[in-house]
Amino acid sequence: LVMIAAVMALAYLGYSKFYATNEVTIISNLINETKNMRASSGYGTSDYNQALINAGALPSSVAYSGSTISNRSGGTITVKGAGVGFTVTDTMLSNKDCINLAQKLGTSEMASTKINSQSFTGEVTAVMATSACTTDSNTVAFTTKS
């Protein structure tokens, strides 16, 4: 009985790490694919979801309907032009996924990282992310420099 519980605990831990890593991979992939769509004048204020879907830029594991891209937690992912850069917003993230995503992608390469209502410029540390990811339905937005 103890052995079964230990195996189940390890399986859950492995699944949780895989799940969180996948969210980082998905958002990182969308950032890279959107950078490939940059016009000479930047991104304007356009919604890039449909362009990413039509270009086949979404990983096969990512669901979408029309121009709405869904994340693994039931929230949505939006990619919208922000002048010379663009913003990727990921909604309804658990505390764990919020912290992991913000810490992994909230780097000095971003113009800003917004977690719920708090904005950060530069690197987002684990401590900063932990203080900002306060619910089980967090929103993280990354705005690129270009």
Go through the PLM ranges and name each one.
Residues 1-19, 23:
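N-terminal single-pass transmembrane signal-anchor helix
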Residues 11-15, 27-45:
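N-terminal alpha-helical signal peptides/signal-anchor transmembrane segments
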Residues 18, 22-31, 146:
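Outer-membrane beta-barrel proteins
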Residues 39-146:
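Periplasmic/extracellular, small/polar-rich flexible segments of pilin-like filament-forming proteins
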